[in-house]
Amino acid sequence: IAAGEVVGRPASVVKELMENAIDAGAGAITVEIAHGGMALIRVTDDGCGIAPDQCQTAFLRHATSKISSEYDLEAIGTLGFRGEALAAIAAVSRVELLTNQGQGLGTALSLEGGQLVEQEEAGCPKGTTMLVRDLFFNTPARLKFMKKDSAEGAAVFAVVQRLALSHPELSV
């Protein structure tokens, strides 16, 4: 149920991943989709990356790196802070994370239906790539509510356009 509140369609996945990239200080974000985002969503950024010991934690519900004390709640300066998005996305898809903080090797992590499949070191540039495949593969009832690929793709485009226009400092 919680995943459905955050992840209603491919456009909501793209929104959450782009907002994470913006919060990570990205200057450039690339968004790629296949079949309206139902088969594949790839969001790549050149932000700060995720520390290797935080990669698994990032996919836990209510886990966030954006709040470290109760006082942070009074001055939230990020787009996301609840720690719901990545857990919700991972729960209903197959996710691959590739991330590097810019020092040495990065980290590759795979999850399926929210369960860890593998984590290993990997060569990759600074930043993060999130690959989301087979959205709602394990919730067939949700698939019935998806519109045609073209309609889902148009919704993704609208989200990308809206975030790009509201953040002119970004290259999207």
Question: What role is predicted for each listed range?
Answer:
Residues A2-V172:
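N-terminal phosphate-binding caps/lids of nucleotide- and nucleic-acid-binding domains
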